[in-house]
């Protein structure tokens, strides 16, 4: 028998939908239910590799972990990975099907709904409850036609909806009441309740506000959720959550990450963010690399050539040269590794017009962007120090050259990855997720002279998910949400 389902939509982006689903997934799992997280459509350049070689959004990876379920591409059947202001790579059930501009993607949506529904019903066949996360705002009625992410999906499956508002931004009453006002009557009829997230202060002071929202909308009040400070200990998927400057570092080694416009997979630096022994900073374009930085990291990119141009336009290429002269280290990961080489060639036009561009020339390697995309979990050891690692590959392109003969990493199957130059001052590789490995992270920080905290990152994430579940059990009517969930049915047709 198919699982019951309930959907969580928001009054806007970044109101806490992803963490709400993760926390409820853990809470219901601890109650003994088999939970499946599901997001019909996600837009993110932070992705995770599934066991079958596909990819899903990082938020769904965290939600799967919260539910203690293996990741599957069906948890996020449509993933959009922005490559420009108007276009994205389109991933369907874990596989890239091409690139599309926003206008062209709108025309694709009716065809994509079939994949969305197939994935949803697969999950529902093997769970007690499916927790569905919407995308962006439920009130974007200009996008309602052909919608597969919010009310379009809810209507197709007749899934009840809970709307989440964020009081920390201010105006939460207007946001929730306004959402009800702009929804079409048949969409509004699917909304069963609301939650107010990120409250600070005495909840009694907002009791009248909760009552006012309920009275004006007719929706059930399901909880006023205090701010959960430990949320920072969980991976953040959206660039909205990307931190800026860190606090003054004192004597701590300073590690800077160049946050170019299309940065991807930046969640892999979350373990470093939790280490008190370093001062981690994400530098926005226009911010120079500090003179006292110990390491400058060039992270992954969804549009390597465009971000390399942006790097040069902001003057970071000059800063990197000065940084190296001062004895600082440079690490490139994935797209950042490609930038460190002498040349990046794109003969088939994966990132725009076919052609090639000069790299930074800090590693004697060249990259050719190819059709094949590497998507796999890997393990092995640092080539020089033989420190074990685990991580994942997620890239297009092949990189080779004289410097690659001194690889940064050696895989357990004998393959190698990356390159090292200037006795380790400059290094690059394709593998993401290295800093989640406690042993490798401690080794890397030790070489910087940082005092390590003994952080057990994976255990910390597990404990934080348990804490989030307990937080929601205290402040949310979880049993009420369970009671609202119902088994999916096709939308009734008019006689």
From Swiss-Prot:
UniProt keyword Chloroplast, yes or no: no
What's any GO biological process attached to this entry?
Answer: cobalamin biosynthetic process
Pfam families found in the cross-reference section = CbiA, GATase_3
Q: What InterPro entries is this protein classified in? A: Class_I_gatase-like (IPR029062), CobQ/CobB/MinD/ParA_Nub-bd_dom (IPR002586), CobQ_GATase1 (IPR033949), CobQ_synth (IPR004459), GATase_3 (IPR011698), P-loop_NTPase (IPR027417)
Q: Name one GO molecular function term.
A: ABC-type vitamin B12 transporter activity
> In terms of domain of life, where is this protein from?
Bacteria
* Active site residues of this protein: 334 (nucleophile), 432
Keywords in UniProt for this one?
Cobalamin biosynthesis, Glutamine amidotransferase
Q: Which PROSITE patterns match?
A: GATASE_COBBQ
Q: What pathway is it annotated to?
A: Cofactor biosynthesis; adenosylcobalamin biosynthesis
Indicate yes or no for the key word Cytoplasm.
no
Protein's job: Catalyzes amidations at positions B, D, E, and G on adenosylcobyrinic A,C-diamide. NH(2) groups are provided by glutamine, and one molecule of ATP is hydrogenolyzed for each amidation.
Q: Which family does it belong to?
A: Belongs to the CobB/CobQ family. CobQ subfamily.
Instruction: Quote the protein name from its UniProt record.
Output: Cobyric acid synthase
Source organism per entry reads Bradyrhizobium sp. (strain ORS 278)
């Amino acid at each position: 028998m198919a699982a019951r389902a309930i959907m969580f939509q928001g009054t806007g982006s970044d109101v806490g939908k992803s963490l709400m689903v993760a926390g409820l997934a853990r809470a219901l799992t601890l109650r003994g239910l088999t939970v499946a997280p599901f997001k019909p459509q996600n837009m993110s350049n932070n992705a995770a590799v599934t066991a079958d070689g596909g990819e899903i959004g990082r938020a769904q990876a965290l939600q799967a972990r919260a539910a203690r379920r293996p990741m599957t591409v069906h948890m996020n059947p449509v993933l959009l990975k922005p490559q420009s202001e108007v276009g994205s790579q389109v991933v369907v059930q874990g596989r890239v099907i091409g690139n599309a501009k926003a206008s062209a993607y709108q025309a694709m949506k009716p065809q994509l709904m079939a994949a969305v529904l197939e994935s949803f019903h697969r999950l529902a066949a093997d769970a007690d409850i499916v927790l569905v996360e919407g995308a962006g705002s439920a009130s974007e009625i200009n996008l309602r036609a052909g919608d597969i992410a919010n009310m379009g999906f809810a209507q197709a499956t007749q899934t009840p909806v809970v709307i989440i508002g964020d009081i920390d931004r201010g105006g939460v009453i207007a946001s929730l009441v306004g959402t009800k006002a702009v929804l079409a009557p048949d969409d509004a009829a699917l909304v069963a309740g609301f939650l107010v997230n990120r409250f600070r202060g005495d909840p009694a002071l907002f009791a009248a506000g909760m009552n006012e929202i309920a009275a004006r909308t007719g929706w059930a009040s399901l909880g006023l959720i205090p701010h959960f400070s430990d949320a920072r200990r969980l991976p953040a998927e959206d660039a909205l959550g990307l931190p800026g400057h860190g606090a003054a570092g004192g004597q701590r080694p300073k590690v800077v990450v160049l946050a170019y416009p299309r940065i991807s997979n930046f969640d892999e630096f979350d373990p470093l963010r939790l280490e008190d022994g370093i001062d981690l900073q994400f530098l926005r374009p226009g911010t120079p690399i500090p003179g006292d930085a110990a390491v400058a990291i060039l992270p992954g990119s969804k549009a390597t050539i465009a971000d390399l141009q942006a790097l040069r336009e902001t003057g970071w290429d000059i800063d990197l040269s000065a940084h190296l002269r001062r004895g600082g280290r440079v690490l490139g990961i994935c797209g950042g590794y490609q930038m460190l080489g002498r040349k990046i060639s794109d003969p088939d036009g994966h990132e725009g017009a076919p052609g090639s561009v000069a790299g930074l020339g800090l590693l004697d390697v060249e990259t050719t962007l190819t059709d094949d995309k590497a998507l796999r979990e890997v393990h092995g050891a640092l080539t020089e120090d033989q420190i074990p690692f685990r991580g994942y590959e997620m890239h297009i392109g092949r990189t080779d050259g004289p410097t690659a003969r001194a690889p940064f990493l050696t895989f357990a199957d004998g393959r190698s990855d990356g390159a090292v130059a200037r006795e380790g001052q400059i290094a690059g590789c394709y593998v993401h997720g290295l800093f989640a490995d406690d042993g490798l992270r401690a080794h890397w920080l030790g070489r910087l002279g940082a005092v390590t905290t003994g952080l057990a990152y994976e255990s910390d994430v597990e404990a934080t998910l348990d804490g989030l579940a307990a937080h929601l059990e205290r402040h949310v009517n979880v049993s009420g949400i369970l009671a609202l969930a119902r088994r999916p049915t096709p939308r009734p047709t008019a006689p």
